[in-house]
Curated annotation (Swiss-Prot):
Residues 173-181 are annotated as: G2 motif. One of its GO terms (molecular function) is magnesium ion binding. It comes from Xenopus laevis. This is Guanine nucleotide-binding protein G(i) subunit alpha-1. Mg(2+) binds at residues 47, 181. Gene3D superfamilies: GI Alpha 1, domain 2-like, P-loop containing nucleotide triphosphate hydrolases. Residues 32-354 form the G-alpha domain.
Length: 354
């Protein structure tokens, strides 16, 4: 009797082949799926990185979407000048021109009555006059002593453009907007044949307990640090230096048992602001033991070492560090390209596909 397969056996073999094929396809699909968790203290630039992904890997912001940011631009601009004026009282700084005190009073009245998404010519004029004042500028230069948005000067210097009735925010204006992230914001995009899911998590302390369920199965963590925070205190805790808070958080993430096999990518962000600030504000404010000069290269390298030294598994775990400026699309594009190559190398080899 010949050794032929019955119809039933043939069907079983086909089923087995199909299961193997599906498993292989699922494995390849899983290998192409990348979960990225964006972590870091508040205002370290995480949400700006997410916006850049939309600009770089999707079609960017449509005119309609840009229009929706108009109210945020105006709110950020008004809140910035108000924060400076309030700080003048606290820091006992006088107006360069005494008549600006009337403008300051007017600012509070007009800002309180302002309709969302609109800026009257009267309000724009008041803000412009105040921003030009010598006392206001002196207070702005001491912004490390109070809480002020990074984008304050960007918007206030461009008031003529943004106060026009026909104003539509540009992609750069949108990148500069500041809205506190609450909860978890998820973004999807495809790059180099990989399907990315990026999770932006609220950085303020009150938000951190919401991170936990995002952690499982994460491919890589991008940890953002604002280099320019070295001389600032936290919005939630006036005693805690922001850089020390970042280091504390990085330590807990980097050495967490859940992340033993997770690639950790460190973005030392806001390098542009740091380069400006280090000329006038010494690094010893944050690191009293710092022996070097206050040059960008030396100070930035020292901060990099402070973070990388927190890694307790140096023999088995590498930290991939990049200096970034999250508002610079070309810089983020270049860095993210390098990050993706690391992810491909580290993760596809685990699946035997690299």
């Amino acid at each position: 009797m010949g050794c032929t397969l019955s119809a039933e056996d043939k069907a079983a073999v086909e089923r087995s082949k199909m299961i193997d094929r599906n498993l292989r396809e699922d494995g390849e699909k899983a290998a192409r799926e990348v979960k990225l968790l964006l972590l870091g203290a508040g205002e370290s630039g995480k949400s700006t990185i997410v916006k850049q992904m939309k600009i770089i890997h999707e079609a960017g912001y449509s005119e309609e979407e840009c229009k929706q940011y108009k109210a945020v631009v105006y709110s950020n601009t008004i809140q910035s000048i108000i924060a400076i004026i309030r700080a003048m009282g606290r820091l006992k700084i006088d107006f360069g021109d005494p008549s600006r005190a009337d403008d300051a009073r007017q600012l509070f009245v007009l800002a309180g009555a302002a309709e969302e998404g609109f800026m009257t010519a009267e309000l724009a004029g008041v803000i412009k006059r105040l921003w030009k004042d010598g006392g206001v500028q002196a207070c702005f230069n001491r912004s490390r002593e109070y809480q002020l948005n990074d984008s304050a000067a960007y918007y206030l210097n461009d008031l003529d453009r943004i106060a026009q009735n026909s104003y539509i925010p540009t992609q750069q204006d949108v990148l500069r907007t500041r809205v506190k992230t609450t909860g978890i914001v998820e973004t999807h995009f495809t790059f180099k044949d990989l399907h990315f899911k990026m999770f932006d998590v609220g950085g303020q302390r009150s938000e951190r307990k919401k991170w936990i369920h995002c952690f499982e199965g994460v491919t890589a963590i991008i940890f953002c640090v604002a280099l320019s925070d070295y001389d600032l205190v936290l919005a939630e805790d006036e005693e805690m230096n922001r850089m020390h808070e970042s280091m504390k958080l990085f330590d807990s993430i980097c050495n967490n048992k859940w992340f033993t096999d997770t690639s950790i990518i460190l973005f030392l962000n806001k390098k542009d602001l740091f380069e400006e600030k280090i000329k006038r504000s010494p690094l010893t404010i944050c690191y009293p033991e710092y022996p070097g000069s206050n040059t960008y290269e030396e100070a930035a390298a020292y901060i990099q070492c402070q973070f990388e030294d927190l890694n307790k598994r140096k023999d088995t775990k590498e930290i991939y560090t990049h200096f970034t400026c999250a508002t610079d699309t070309k810089n983020v594009q270049f860095v993210f390209d390098a990050v993706t190559d690391v992810i491909i190398k580290n993760n596809l080899k685990d699946c035997g596909l690299f």
